[in-house]
Amino acid sequence: MKLQKIVSRLQELHPKEIDLSLDRIQSLCKKLGNPQDKIKAISIVGTNGKYSTIQAMFSILKEANFNCNIYTSPHIKSINERFVFNNEELNDEDLANLLEEVEEANNGEPITFFEILTAAYFLKASQYPDNINLIESGLFFRFDATNILKNNLASVVTSIGLDHLD
């Protein structure tokens, strides 16, 4: 119940105007100590097959004794699916506490729900500096909130549909 209340509050912060810049996510992450600069990531971009690609990479890395964190969007059953740390989904209580911490740092500023979730992911992922982060990126990466990573080890491009060629 606590998690649902926090999610509802965070969704109300959505800005009234569309702004495709990365200013909001950069500002929030700066308040959080720039956690995105402390993680090693592989970004997965494309129109189709991102989740399947992430799951295949996760299986390979896990078999090779790497610990992984995963950030995907959207979720199917529960928001927790988006947040995998040390090979395990984040439980409701830990996710609620994480989102509250990020909400407090944001201080009521307009921000998209995705940007809040992304900042929360970066903050938690920074607690696992040796893990490989498999991060699904949208908007063909350029204006996606995940595109503020400093230590992107690689980018994997899945199939590209015509809708992403404009």
Language-model regions, residue ranges each:
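A conserved segment at the C-terminal end of the G1
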Residues: 40-44, 52-69
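Conserved beta-strand/loop subsegment of P-loop NTPase cores
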Residues: 154-161
